[in-house]
Design a protein with these regions (language model features):
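Flexible, solvent-exposed loop/hinge segments and secondary-structure transition points
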Residues: 20-163
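Bacterial N-terminal signal peptides
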Residues: 3-16
Length: 163
């Protein structure tokens, strides 16, 4: 009887631990943070003389913010979104994806709303991606990526101290 009781006690106390993994917590980017990242990228590119589009997506690739400078055309917005989606797919910058997976870049670029070109960066908190930013419109993907980085830099302290 004692063995049965001991076994039941172990089972009962082990159940909450097993159930604890049924629910997870995730960090999500606020609209305010996404707006500040996008505005930072726009401001950075304007300072350098470029008219760009910026798209900020959440960790699942859902669009949170779209900003298009006055002379940036609609295709730049599509390209920026597709670059951000490449980041969500790979959990790394779109330039790193292009370099690291050169063997399948052509196939990846056939996917709808995904483009493996420089200009997309992850937004991370404590090593976890909470979103991505894509930029298009500067004269070169490296410059798009630099503007995206400056957008993230604008909020980096907030990211560093996020709970």
């Amino acid at each position: 009887m004692r063995r049965i009781l001991a076994g039941l006690l172990v089972f009962v106390f082990a159940m909450p631990a097993a159930r604890a993994t049924d629910v997870i917590s995730v960090k999500l980017m606020t609209l305010e943070l996404a707006v500040d990242i996008a505005q930072g990228a726009i401001d950075a590119c304007r300072k350098d003389g470029y008219q760009i589009s910026v798209v900020v997506v959440d960790r699942s690739g859902r669009t949170q913010v779209v900003m298009r400078d006055i002379f940036a055309n609609q295709y730049m917005t599509q390209l920026a979104r597709a670059k951000a989606n490449a980041v969500v797919l790979s959990n790394t910058s779109s330039s790193a994806l292009r370099k690291n997976r050169a063997d399948i870049v052509n196939e990846l670029n056939l996917l709808d709303d995904l483009l493996v070109m420089d200009g997309g960066l992850p937004v991370t908190v404590a090593g976890s991606m909470i979103g991505a930013v894509g930029v298009s419109g500067a004269p070169g993907g490296d410059l798009d990526e630099a503007c995206a980085q400056r957008g993230i830099d604008r909020v980096q302290e907030r990211l560093d101290f996020a709970e």
